[in-house]
Swiss-Prot record:
This is Glutaredoxin-C2. SUPFAM superfamilies: Thioredoxin-like. Residues 3-103 form the Glutaredoxin domain. Transmembrane segments: none annotated. Belongs to the glutaredoxin family. CPYC subfamily. Has a glutathione-disulfide oxidoreductase activity in the presence of NADPH and glutathione reductase. Reduces low molecular weight disulfides and proteins. Disulfide bonds join C23-C26. It holds the Pfam family Glutaredoxin. The gene is GRXC2. It is found in: Cytoplasm. Keywords: Cytoplasm, Disulfide bond, Electron transport, Redox-active center, Transport. PROSITE patterns: GLUTAREDOXIN_1 (PS00195), GLUTAREDOXIN_2 (PS51354). One of its GO terms (cellular component) is cytoplasm.
């Protein structure tokens, strides 16, 4: 049931960060996404009544029990290191743009 709820959340938004309010790695990922101008949904598992069940469902689904647990365009990205590495490699913004999370950053041709 919790895995199904996690999947529904992931499928309802272009970018989802499963997080905990006190986690410094979660804060880092959310700040990075904000700096890039990305729209995202943060699900704070420590404030959700069924947060621990959702976290268990995520672990069963993705093999990752830790937070942050990042999804872009319905695809599991991973945690803080994976997200930061994508950004360092220049791959995060294109993923966010493709998912529709960054408005006005689509490829345009000048006339």
């Amino acid at each position: 049931m919790a895995m199904q709820k996690a999947k529904e959340i992931v499928n309802s938004e272009s970018v989802v960060v499963f997080s905990k309010t006190y986690c410094p790695y979660c804060v880092r990922v959310k700040e990075l996404l904000q700096q890039l101008g990305a729209k995202f949904k943060a699900v704070e598992l420590d404030t959700e009544s069924d947060g621990s069940q959702i976290q268990s469902g995520l672990a069963e689904w993705t093999g990752q029990r830790t937070v942050p647990n990042v999804f872009i365009g319905g695809n599991h990205i991973g945690g803080c290191d994976a997200t930061s590495n994508l950004h360092k490699d220049g791959k995060l913004v294109p993923l966010l743009t493709e998912a529709g999370a960054i408005a006005g950053k689509t490829a345009t041709t000048s006339a």
